[in-house]
């Protein structure tokens, strides 16, 4: 059994990205994995202030901000698997998800333990090439942290959950969850 953390970046809790998350979550739970889901777009997470308090010699190594990152960060550090889920916003992830990732900085080396990563990405546009910029960002983040991207669902042309249901993406997400 693996510890799986889902960081869902969409503010639409019943939207396309949420549907992908649900399918992958059910797949992972079906084979016995422990899954913790954070809907980061509805949580209170302040942006990094670049104050460097988390890296000051003699300090406690923690971010000075007290917010929902106090729950998210330790869960990610302890996870074996991290699933990033986001709709495409101007060829990138949502700002809410990016804010959480920026705050990984305060966890220093403890965040750099090997993990498996899966991407669940959705966009309304029909061209799958639209995902290239954001997948590049995730590849860079994972390379820096020493994490390995094991799978991706790139759901283009899926503006609504109804659009998504007409594609194989939900089944792909479910099966990917089972293969963790």
Predicted regions and their residues:
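Glycine-rich beta-alpha junction loops
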Residues: 44, 124, 156-159
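Short active-site-adjacent structural elements
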Residues: 128-129, 160-162
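A charged, well-structured terminal subsegment
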Residues: 138-156, 164, 174-175, 179-180
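Short beta-strands and strand-loop turn motifs
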Residues: 7-8, 85, 119-123, 153-155
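N-terminal beta1-alpha1-beta2 submodule of the flavodoxin-like/Rossmannoid cofactor-binding fold
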Residues: 1-85, 91-107, 162, 167-180
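A short, structured active-site edge motif that brings together acidic residues
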Residues: 39-43, 116, 153-155
